[in-house]
Amino acid sequence: LATEGAAAREAYWSKLVATLTYQRTGSEAKFAKSGFAGFAQDGAFARCLAQVQKRFAANVEVEPGVAMNQALTENLFVGLVCILNKLPLFIVGKPGTSKTLTMQVITSNLLGQQSPREFFRKFPAIHVVQYQCSPMSSSDAIQRQYEMACRYQAHAHDTLTCLLLDEVGLAEHSPDMPLKVLHSILVHPPIAIIGLSNWALDPAKMNRAVCIRRTEPSPLDIELTAA
């Protein structure tokens, strides 16, 4: 019986490997025909993404003394992509990881035709409706801010509205569980929604949005920030 079991396992794994190899070969062939064969190389997509982020960051205007480090660069790039596509986003990290600064830089650079750089004049202006979360927050208050942002968007011209939930993690301390309202408004929202938090929320919220979790900065990032 042991021999038969071992033979069955060997046959199963052989079949599985053969199937995966066939699927991978077919996928690679389709990938090559699509014109993106260069991305098949290890790390090619990551390098391309880093170059796009670098170009994006080079067109951002920041105040003197603000370092365009990795945290701020990634936050800005992902934040802009999510806002333009109305994808909910949570930026999670300790104080000092450029969460609030990210939104300040986005709103000061994306002003439509009044943007300080030509690069951003092709994008719509960003209008932020902010709600400061706290342990006293209520689901009704969050819902009202959301509806107000939606009404603004309905009458806006060449403008994208973003609901900013600042310190959203603090609302989890409320016994009334006000963040349960996010379960519905995070599903295909007509506006962009961004939440900033010092710690991760429960999976019921996080799984409904893109999430950036800022870890400890690298030595290179610390050096760049201090320069």
Task: Map each language-model feature to its residues.
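Hydrophobic/aromatic beta-strand patches that form the interior of the parallel beta-sheet core
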Residues: 89, 129-131, 194, 210-213
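Conserved catalytic/switch belt of AAA+ P-loop NTPases
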Residues: 111-112, 146-155, 160-196, 201, ...
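Short, structurally constrained coil/turn elements
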Residues: 122-124, 187, 205
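A short helix-turn-beta junction within AAA+ P-loop NTPase domains corresponding to the substrate/partner-engaging
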Residues: 126-127, 201-227
